[in-house]
Amino acid sequence: VERERSMSSVLDADTVLAIDVGSVSTRASLFDVVDGRYRLIATGRAPSTAGAPLFDISEGVRMALDQVQAVTGRQLLDESELLIMPVTSQGAGADVFVATASAGPKVRTVLVGLMPGVSTTSAQRMADSTYLELVEVINLLDRRRDEEKISRIAAARADLILVVGGTDGGARDSVMQMIDLVAVGVELIPARQRPRIVYAGNRRLASVVAERFGNRLDIAQAPNVRPALRHEDLVHARLAIGEAIAEARGKRVNGFQELEQWSGGYLMLTADAYGRVIKYLSRIYDPEKAVIGVDVGASHTMVAASFEGDLRLRVDTDLGLGKPLPIILKRSNLENIMRWLPLDLPKQAVLDYIHNKSIHPGLVPSEDTALHLELALARELIRTALKQARTSWPRGKDLKSTWLLPPTEPIIASGSVLARTPHPGYAALTLLDALEPIGISTMVLDPHGLSPSLGAASGPVPMLAVHVLESGSYISLGTVVAPVGRTRPGRKILTLQIEPEQGSEAIAGEVRMGQLAVIPLRQGEYARLTLRPERGIDVGFGGAGKAGALRIAGGALGLIIDARGRPLKLDTDPARRRDTNEKWLWDIGAKE
C-alpha cells in the first residue's frame, strides 16, 4: 500500500515538457498524469528557426510552446520568457523538461585509425549512427605520404577529429604514429578554427596521448571503441561524440545553450533518444523478432533495429525530404523513384519537384500529384537507407545472409510525410512497399513524432514511455500478414479465419498469390486469427506449410493481407505498373 501511495505521488508531481528541434519543425509536447497514468495533453508545432536567417532555435521553441500554452491555458514561460520549473501552486510550468535536437549543420569529421575492419570499422559504424559527415578517413594502410595526410587533416575544415585504434593494452607505436600526424595537422590550423579531438583508442595510452597534445589542443578522452579484438563498445564513446556535436552546432546556431540549462545540461541528440525507445521496445516484445523503427525527416532518414536489446542505429544524413533530397538521384535513380507513381508524369516534372522540395522543405503537398511524388520519394529513401543499414545488422539478419527482412514486431514509423497523409492507407502502403515485412507483424505510426521525447524522458521519468506507448498517441495501422513462398499469381496460398472477441460473426476466406486486401478490425478491438498456409508457403509459424493461431489487435485499417510476394516485383511495363499502383491504393482503402 505504501509503495502504491508513493508511486501515485510521484506521478501526480511530474508534469513533463519535451522539445524536439528538427531542421524544418520544432515540436513541443506536454505530458501529465490522468487517472494515474501519463498521457499526452497537447502538442505544438512551429517552423524551425535553426537555419537562415535567424540561426537561433529559440524563436521556434517559443512559438511551439506558445501553441501548447494556447491549447491548454497553462502558463509555461514567465515574463522573462524563461521556463517555469517546477510546477507552481497555480499549476503553471513543468516539473521535468527534456530536449532533443537534430537541427543544425552536419559535423564535418576526420576519422583516424589503425586497421580497416577493426577499430576503424567500429568508428565508422558509430559515425553512421549519428550526425557526423566523414570528410576524410586515414589509416595505417593508407598509401599516401605522411605530408599528404597532414595536409588533408589541415585542409579538411573539420569540426571533429576522431582517433581510434589499438585494443586496450595492445598496439602502442602505431597509435602514437597516427597521434603525431593529427597533432601536426591540427597545429597548422588557426587556433580559433581548430577542431575538437576525441581519442577512443587503446586506454593504456590515454595519459601519453594527453601529454602529446598538451594544453594547446582541445582533446576529449573516451572509452575504447574496440577494447578487445572481438568486443565492440560504442555506447560510452557516443557520449563524447555527442558533446562534440553539441559544441560544433553551438558555434553556428544559437539557442542550444538555453535548452541545455532548462534540461539540466542533458540535451540529447534526437537519434540517440530515438534509438533508446526502439531498444526499450525490443525488451518487451517478442524476443524472436526485431523491432524496426523508421523516421523520414527533412535532413536525414533514420533506421533503427533492435534484436533483444542489441540496437543497430543508422542516421543517413544524405537522405532526407529536404535539403539533401537531390542526393537520392545518386544513391538510387530517377526510374526507381518513378516506379512507385500511380500516375504518368514527365521525368522533368519529377526532377523539378525534387529540387524545389530541397529548397523549400517545409512545403506540404496540397494536391494528389505532390502527395504521390512525396510518397514515392519516401519509399525510395527508406529502401535506400534500409539497404545500407542492414550491412551492420547481426549475422543471419543482414543482407549478406538473406534479402528478406527478418521477422519484426512491431514496425514503428514516423515523419511528416507519413503522418500527414489524407488516409492511413497511404502510409501503410508506403511502408509495405519500402520495408517488405514478412510473416506477421504490426505497423505503428508515431504521428506526433513523440519517440525521441519519450527516449529522452526515460531517464528522469521511466514510466512516461510505458504509459504513452500504451495510449492512443501512437496509431496502430493494423496487423500485417505477408506470406513468403513461390507460386504463380492467382493460386490459393492461404486459408484464414478471424473470430472477433466482441461477438461479431467470424470471417473465413482464402488468400491468393498477388492479393492485397484489408479486413476491417477497429482500434481497441481484438480477434483470434487462424492461418493455414498451403505447402511451400511460410506465414511465420516456424516454417513453410505450418499453420497457427494468435490474438491480434485492430488498427486504423485492421488486418492487412499482403500476398504480393517477396521480393515485391513491379511490372516492367510503365502503364501496367501505374495501373497496379493505383489498384493497390484502392485495395488498401486509401482511395474510397
Give the positions of each predicted feature.
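Nucleotide/phosphate-binding catalytic cleft detector across ATP-hydrolyzing
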Residues: 1-18, 32-39, 45-55, 59-62, ...
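N-terminal-proximal low-complexity accessory segments that begin disordered
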Residues: 20-32
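An acidic- and aromatic-residue-enriched active-site/binding cleft used to recognize and process polar
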Residues: 22, 139-140, 166, 202, ...
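Short flexible coil/turn linkers enriched for glycine and charged/polar residues
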Residues: 22-25, 103-106, 297
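Glycine-rich phosphate-binding loop of actin/hexokinase-like ATP-binding domains
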Residues: 30, 38-49, 279-280, 286-348, ...
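Long, contiguous domain-sized segments
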Residues: 288-291, 298, 344-365, 374, ...
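Active-site core segments that coordinate phosphate-bearing ligands/cofactors
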Residues: 315-395
